[in-house]
Amino acid sequence: MKSQWHGTCDLRLFKSSRSNNKDVVKTIHQAKCTAPLKVMRVFNDKKDGRCEIPILHSAGGIVGGDQLTINVNAEEDSIAICSSVAAQKVYGSRGRSKLNPQGSWANQKCFFQIKKNSDFEWIPQELIVYQGGLFEQNMTVNLDLSSSFLCVDLVRLGRTAAEEQLGNGVWRSSLEIFRDNNQGKHYEFSDRLELSGEALKSIHGLEQKPVFGSLTWITPKKIKQKDLSDLLVECREQRAGLEGFMTCSLLENGISARYTGSSTQSARFWFYRIWSLTRILRKLSMPEYMRIWPMQENPSRDKKCPS
């Protein structure tokens, strides 16, 4: 008897033609979902009119064979942030046996279409892959030259508190970002990763650390390289006082940051500070912790964090 989920979430984001405040044009949304994915209450009460979208996985966890598809169409001049309601869990693969030693994979596919002058931020909460879990995510982004895209991945491999490691599990990720120019669509950025086996132990991999995180920001074309270089210096300074190994580098039009260590909190704090700096660079409102995020945390308390 099959028990896999095939959940979908289709989102359309567009600026509202009506607003009580003439100085703020709000972004509103349309959503269509199938179980186990569900869009919870959406807020667009930010000072800049940004739409805050929480997505819930109502089944409480992912198992082998589950397939999730998220489609986002961000229309012109829309600004939004999407996150998950809680940390997501990927349980050990179902179907492992002598006849099927590879087990069954869980898969999540995201397709983001970000149109002219839009700003889209994809910042889900932590993903926890249990021992033996098999999870693959594929993200494809089509980004206009005038638009901005920021995404964060934060994954814990094994339940560390229970002294559990990933074992024969695998976490696999693919991120492809395209842009259109006069010659047609071209690659802006591509990043493929697989964490399993020897990569979990090697000094060139995770070196036995259970937490991996990445932040990617692709800027509007109008951002100058000098500003990006200055941003890189500031991002590195924001590592002070945090636990783990953190690296940050320039892309042709953006930045890429990676975290390896034992603390998801340190990773969150560092990524929050980088996120704040990307807003400051564009003279946008400072990011606020979403209502669904851990409220006991406040990375801005650090004197080195922008305020």
UniProtKB/Swiss-Prot annotation:
Its main location: cytoplasm. InterPro entries: UreD. It is found in: Cytoplasm. The keyword Cell membrane does not apply. One of its GO terms (molecular function) is nickel cation binding. It comes from the Bacteria. Keywords: Chaperone, Cytoplasm, Nickel insertion. GO terms for cellular component: cytoplasm. Belongs to the UreD family. UreD, UreF and UreG form a complex that acts as a GTP-hydrolysis-dependent molecular chaperone, activating the urease apoprotein by helping to assemble the nickel containing metallocenter of UreC. The UreE protein probably delivers the nickel. Required for maturation of urease via the functional incorporation of the urease nickel metallocenter. This is Urease accessory protein UreD. It comes from Prochlorococcus marinus (strain NATL1A).
